Structures are given as structure tokens and as C-alpha cells.
Amino acid sequence: MNRQPYGTPPQWWPPRLTPWWIRATRGWRRNMLRRKQRIVEVDFHGVDILRREIDAGHGVLITPNHAVHYDSAALYLAADQVDLPLYFMVAWQVFSMSSTFECWFMQRIGCFSVNREATDRQAMKQAIHILQNEPYPLVIFPEGDVYHTTDEVTPFREGAAALALSAAKRSKREIVAVPCGIKFWYLEDVRSSILETLELLEERLFQRTHPELREQDRIHRLAEAIIALKELDYLGYTNQGRVRQRTGQLVETILQHIEQRHATPISRRGDIPNRVKALRQSVIAKLEANIELPDVDIPPDEQRRLVRDMEDLFFVMQLYSYRGDYLDGQPSLERVAETLDKLEEDILERDLPTVRGRRRAEVRFGTPIPIASGESRTSVADLTMQLQQAVQAQIDAINACRH
């Protein structure tokens, strides 16, 4: 996972969608995807669904899986096929870490910022306005982050469903959610690149290379080493058992420690992202109060502990992002490569993983889901699960067609 700043955003970046600019940059956007990410083929299925829903006067929410950092570019190529600009809800950190021109460009292709660690009323108002009034779809990635586990959709966060239900409550037009699956494949044998990355990772962790082992077994050895190091760091000893079990235990230990420090009730729902979000809000409020309020003076030792808490919460989300069973059985080349992509980001601390060869992308849209008005927690939870299952069905359909 990529490191990024957390706190109160320095500003809000509104969308400045410019349809003629989107049309004018089609070739450039496609060439950038080809040149920087070596995506030489993009296939589309069901993209006419978007045009049909827009022509019917409906508000359209697109909910794709977040396969890679540049999947939004592939999604835009799909929308180009039916001449549809798109709006994107984007984490404010993406804007704050971009150049002035990149921010300008993102706004012109429909991006606007959201603070995911708080209740961002400005972003919510903008999203609801788009769904109720604008003639173009809104894209929200309900997974929230890139987890590099395309074949298994990470549990959706509830924000997209809550926004859709809120918009439908007072909308004069029908609002639908269109599930979307996005997947990337290598078009050539990239095992030499995979082996090179494995050797780099093993060297970083002071492991000997075992070329006689399968790639997934070498990755498992890396995982064993990492979890043992982190157990020593946080617990002072190493546990026994499967990596997945030990990861869950370590996550719970870290979260409970921070929740106790900040007097936050321990959630029993097992919803790790929401627990992390609540703790980040608490820590950020204390750190910013020390800066903004003259009568608040947090001792240096406590400031350092708060900063460490933020680091620990980031580490918790890193652990959460590893399924533990993604390479079981006979994993595909793509699954092995995806897992190495994650390890490159987490261990080698690269902003973007290695592009290992020429690739093909597929973007598939599913049957629209009508959004009924209602904002109860049950409605939000039910719609979230429905959207997640519908997106998983698109990924499964992509895989079924390929084999």
C-alpha cells in the first residue's frame, strides 16, 4: 500500500468537467496507458449499458473493483466508446501529492476530492448533486484502496451505498448502480521479472535464494519472515500457526492497544477499516489541536506516541490487505505477480510496482441495480453487499470467458 498524508485536507478540489477536453485527450490518454503501463489491448463488455441508462435520464453510479492504481484510466477508455465523460470521487491525498498541472487535468476529466477519514459534507453534497442532476455517471471505488487481489473483491465500504440511497431519497429521477469488473493480464511470459523481484525481496529480508522452490512457496517464506519480524517488534516473541491466523492476531493486538490508549470502545463487529478510521480521526484531532489551539500543549513524548499510532494504523491496513489464501492451490501468473506488486510497495517502498511486460485489460459492466430510497443501516449494509456480489460476478465472468 502507498504511504500518504493524513489529516485535515488543505483545500477541497471541485470537479471542473470539460467534455471537449475529454474528447480531445482520448488518443493521448490511451497512449499514456500504453507507454507507461504497457497496456496494449483493452476489451469492453456491456459499455452500452451506460449509454442506455444515461439516455433514459437516470442518475448512474458506477462501482468498480480497484484492481490497480491506473484502472480509472482503463475505465475512461470504456466510457470513451459511448462518448460519456465521467465524474470520479478521489481521495484528497491524490490531489495533494500531485503537481499543479496534474490537479488541473484531473479536475477537467471530472475528479473531485473526498476526505475518507471524516464526514466530508462538501464531497457528499457534490456526489449527491451529480447523481440527482448531472447527465454523466459518477464513479466510486467502494474497496477504497488498491489491494492487488483482483480475483477476490475486498469487502466494500459502505460509503458508496449510503450516498446512492441518500441521493435516491429526494431525487426526481431514477438512480441506478452499475457494477463494473476490471482485470489486467500479461500477454507474455514475465517469469524472469517475477524471479528478479523475488530475489530483491529475499535480499532485503536477508534470506537465501531457493530457485528450486515454486514462486508461491518463496513468497510464503517471505510472508513468514515478515510476520515473525513484526511479532518480535510488537509482541517481543513469535507465534506459531498459519500466517493468516497470526496476521489476524497481530492486527487485533495492535488495534486493541491503540483503542485502549484513546479510550475508544472496542468494536466487536470485526470491521477493521472502520475501527482504523475511527482511531485515525481521534489521533488526527489530537495532533491538529496541538498545532491549532494555543491552550493545548501536548508533551513531546505524547506527540511521538501519536505519530507512532498513525504509523501502526497504516501497518494494520497493510496486514488487512493480505488475504492469506490468494496463492493457495495452483495460482495463476497474474495472482503471483499481483502479490509481488503488493510486496514491492510494502517492503521495497515503491510508489508503483514493476511493469513486467505487455498487458491486456478487460472492463465489464453488469446489470444495473435500481436504488430504492431509504437510509437505514440495514438498507446501506444490504446494498453494499449487493454491489460487492455484483462486482465479484463481473470478475468471475471475465475469468470464465478467458478459460
Protein language model regions, located:
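Membrane-interfacial terminal anchoring regions of lipid-handling membrane enzymes
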Residues: 1-70, 77-84, 92-94, 121-122, ...
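Short, polar/flexible loop-turn hinges at active-site or ligand-entry regions and domain interfaces
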Residues: 112-117
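Short helix/loop capping segments that flank catalytic or ligand/cofactor-binding pockets
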Residues: 71-72, 98-99
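Membrane helical hairpin/interfacial module
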Residues: 90-96, 102-103
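Domain-scale detector for complete catalytic domains at protein termini or as standalone homologs
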Residues: 105-106, 110
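ATP-grasp fold ATP-binding core
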Residues: 138-145
